[in-house]
Amino acid sequence: MALNIENIVAELENATILELSELVKAIEEKFDVTAAAPVAAAAGAGDAAAAKDSFDVELTSAGDKKVAVIKEVRGITGLGLKEAKELVDGAPTMIKEGLSESEANEVKEKLEAAGASITLK
């Protein structure tokens, strides 16, 4: 059985975000690696934090209003009901990655208004 890159790419194109997230976790566990980008060695931690231009929105808890949070996650991510529910049920989990500060704060405000606990990273 030959490894066909085109077939793998085609399968990945059809996968949901939740399935891709599970794939990344499985690869990390199997090969004992992380998907995090390499960090520049001793470039000055204070400078790196001040120059941060990309933010990730992490759902830490759905809170008491889980249905409202699921609806908001669907609106933000474009996921279907089942995928959004699985994402919320799997908290803590990333909702959106690579956002600007203003976009991340906007998503955070929407989810917190729905009753969720959010962390920006």
UniProtKB/Swiss-Prot annotation:
It holds the Pfam family Ribosomal_L12_N. It comes from the Bacteria. Keywords: Ribonucleoprotein, Ribosomal protein. GO terms for molecular function: mRNA binding; structural constituent of ribosome. Disulfide bonds: none annotated. GO terms for cellular component: cytosolic large ribosomal subunit. CDD domains: Ribosomal_L7_L12. SUPFAM superfamilies: ClpS-like, Ribosomal protein L7/12, oligomerisation (N-terminal) domain. GO terms for biological process: translation. NCBIfam families: L12. Belongs to the bacterial ribosomal protein bL12 family. HAMAP family: Ribosomal_bL12 (MF_00368). Homodimer. Part of the ribosomal stalk of the 50S ribosomal subunit. Forms a multimeric L10(L12)X complex, where L10 forms an elongated spine to which 2 to 4 L12 dimers bind in a sequential fashion. Binds GTP-bound translation factors. This is Large ribosomal subunit protein bL12. It comes from Lactococcus lactis subsp. lactis (strain IL1403).
